[in-house]
Design a protein with these regions (language model features):
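Non-heme Fe(II)/2-oxoglutarate
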Residues: 1-64
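PAPS-dependent sulfotransferase catalytic domain
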Residues: 33, 159-160
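Catalytic core of non-heme Fe(II) oxygenases with the double-stranded beta-helix
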Residues: 58-151, 155-157, 163-164, 168-172
Length: 172
């Protein structure tokens, strides 16, 4: 997958909606043979809606990856859909922070309650890029320190963020 990503970065135009991150759609059929056994063991039999190869160059603030189900599946709306992260490479320390709060809105909104959660200094350091408004609407962060080869999965409705990796010298 690293070779594929390197080739895409060198030769293909990234998705405009995800710039400045380098993000490329990949047909699941091209990677199904390698990914299907991993996904099946992690989630059970599942349908893959989207595959992206990405090089993230700015920290992601608090958001979720929820997209409403379409008519192309036999799943009922509300059935869990998972985001699965397969870290390929980073040039330094990286974390994904997952919160228990869920929403069908892409980021915390006025409709989401203020939690009153008191973040530790370590959590605050990891999330210096997240606006206070969003921080007030999430709680109890699960911090996942990852490296190449890991597999991390969470419900797409859960709010999550990257750490502020630039603060500790990681550029992607």
């Amino acid at each position: 997958f690293n070779k594929i990503l390197d080739n895409f970065i060198a030769n293909k135009k990234p998705r405009e909606e995800n710039l400045p991150h380098l993000s490329y759609s990949v047909s699941y059929a091209h990677v199904e043979k390698k990914l299907s056994p991993i996904l099946d063991s992690l989630l059970g039999s599942c349908e893959v809606a989207e595959v992206l190869l990405q090089r993230v160059v700015q920290p992601h603030s608090i958001h979720n990856d929820y997209r409403p189900p379409t008519n192309t599946t036999d799943r009922e709306p509300g059935e869990p859909h998972y985001a699965v992260l397969f870290p390929l490479r980073a040039d330094g320390l990286s974390h994904t922070i997952i919160f228990p709060e869920q929403s069908v809105n892409a980021s915390p909104s006025e409709d989401d309650p203020v939690t009153g959660y008191e973040f530790t200094d370590e959590h605050k350091k990891l999330l210096t890029h997240a606006p206070d408004y969003s921080m007030h609407r999430v709680s109890d962060p699960q911090v996942v320190k990852w490296s190449a080869g890991d597999v991390i999965a969470w419900d797409r409705k859960n709010f999550h963020a990257s750490d502020n990796f630039i603060e500790h010298g990681t550029s992607y």
